[in-house]
């Protein structure tokens, strides 16, 4: 289901090194991690614990925001813990069955329904953030995945869509329009072939497109080709039974299998793009802020995802701020409300390059000042929510896609196995 959305990016980095949230060391659990202080009589301070998957920019930004929140809300103290992303889910899920669960935390949006069904999280406090207000002020595609049985259980963060990036110098060398970029999928695939180079022995020396099956890219292509990836009426993956989806996947993987525009042994995808070894990438708008910092000499262009006819459908992936079942509802929702406020969303967007979800920010002059940011905003005019948004689903997809890359197994057969594994995972509990 497509929804208009909002987004942007910036390469502005947060200045200075800030102390840990709420006076706690950000690399270790706070003393309050074993349970929050309950909301008590007037004048009592409530202590919340907050967890998020760690990255330097996000951690520093959250530290700053928590200090701002505590100054504005002296009756609430927030202790933070920043967990390495590789360990985050393994640490979080077991904690939800114990007193060690955080009060407020980030979770992939695909986990919300499972956590809500299990009773591990609670709906947002309607007295603080009403359903009417959320649906009036936020873009639907940003919040749809955070709703369960007509109640909102969280607010969005870390939202991304898919854009097209290309190396202008490599494109020009290949005789391509380096300023315009590929506008259709036929052009995109032709560009990938044109920018692929091999030496006399046949060894790859330049890859045309760093394609490795990242699911939002693939699902965007399937959607544009008229395929059905997921049936919302049955809550089941259906791509292996859909002729258009299978045909789209056969075309997609043929660029790797047959045209050999990339080889995973040649270079990692984004590392190779930064080094000038890969001609094109599909990826998140956050790379618009990342690339000038990590590859300052890279001459790159960016455009909307290639089109099929009038469709530039782009898949949205996101996380959400939610609160555990044990959290003090009013205080925890106030913290989530703060993190979702217009001012904070704008700060977060400019500092981290992630998508704003508030409608009011879609035409923000500061965000749109960067021409590349305007492209990112436009990409969300034809956006839809993806359904592979849990770690387990992503792993099952990646394992199947590796078979497509590294073996000559029949595409439909691999997709049928993948679909069965994904649907089985949907039926699994936490």
Where do the model's predicted regions map?
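Long, aromatic- and glycine/proline-rich binding clefts that accommodate carbohydrate-like moieties
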Residues: 145, 303, 349-403, 428
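Extracytoplasmic/periplasmic substrate-recognition and gating elements
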Residues: 67, 71-72, 77, 172-174, ...
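Short, solvent-exposed loop/beta-turn-alpha elements that line the ligand-binding surface or hinge
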Residues: 122-138, 180-183, 199-208, 227-247, ...
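Periplasmic solute-binding protein
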Residues: 112-120, 141-180, 210-234, 315-323, ...
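Hinge/lid segment of periplasmic solute-binding proteins
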Residues: 40, 108-163, 189, 222, ...
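Extracytoplasmic "Venus flytrap"/periplasmic binding protein-like
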Residues: 68-138, 147, 173-175, 183, ...
